[in-house]
Amino acid sequence: MIGSLAGAFAFGTVLPVPAGSTATLGRGVMTALPGVGIVLGAVAAAVLWAGSWAFGPHSALAGLLAVAVLLLATRGMHIDGLSDTVDGLGCYGAPERALRVMRDGSAGAFGAASIVVAVGAQTLAFSMLPGGWSGAVGVVVAVTAGRVAALVACRRGIPAAEGSALGGRVAGTQPAAVVLVWLAAVAALAIPATERIWQGPLTVVVAVGMTALLVRHCVRRFGGITGDVLGAAIEVTTTVVAVGLVIR
């Protein structure tokens, strides 16, 4: 378990985890990925709190700094995956052509727009969260729910897209029970994030459900999942949860 968690940090963050202490990327590492989300969410929440202290309550700049820390801590690979996935979904042609577009490395119009929307929505939503522990919990929930969505994308029965090295190592590795346990845990964690006790859990479930539909569409379009699809699942879910938690 320790090796899997270390592997999850090595895979999902810039932390210099010693190679000898990590498990090989696969089922165990992916199962531990939401644990990385908890830590990243706590760091982002601390930055949001510090920014709110420095710039005033509900400062958009504080929200932007929290998002920036997440981007730095993850090497921006998830937001890059969102951009590539949106570009792939936005092109015409066979799955092979869509995959070539995704592997091109440059962001198209759709991909660039998706980055702006995701970063902007997360920034504003984080800044609108209530102060104190409720707001901190909200950030942790949003970031962790994104990693639970990655497990949904790797659940049993989901294939890897042709030629995807990362997809081939993690696709279909997560049993439904693992996904449900993590989903229930994050939904329970979301209870104190809002004044209405049902709003947080409902937001998490709806967001993860929406991402499951996105993953299904990606499987139809690309023939399976790729590392970019995992990044898209993480960013979409994080964004939807953050926005859902600030609905009045």
Curated annotation (Swiss-Prot):
Which protein family is named in the record? Belongs to the CobS family.
Instruction: List GO terms (cellular component aspect).
Output: plasma membrane
The EC designation for this entry is 2.7.8.26
GO BP annotations of the record are: cobalamin biosynthetic process
Q: Record the organism.
A: Mycobacterium sp. (strain KMS)
PANTHER family named in the record: ADENOSYLCOBINAMIDE-GDP RIBAZOLETRANSFERASE
The record's subcellular locations are: Cell membrane
Q: What protein name is recorded for this chain?
A: Adenosylcobinamide-GDP ribazoletransferase
Q: Which UniProt keyword terms apply here?
A: Cell membrane, Cobalamin biosynthesis, Magnesium, Membrane, Transferase, Transmembrane, Transmembrane helix
The organism's lineage is:
Bacteria, Bacillati, Actinomycetota, Actinomycetes, Mycobacteriales
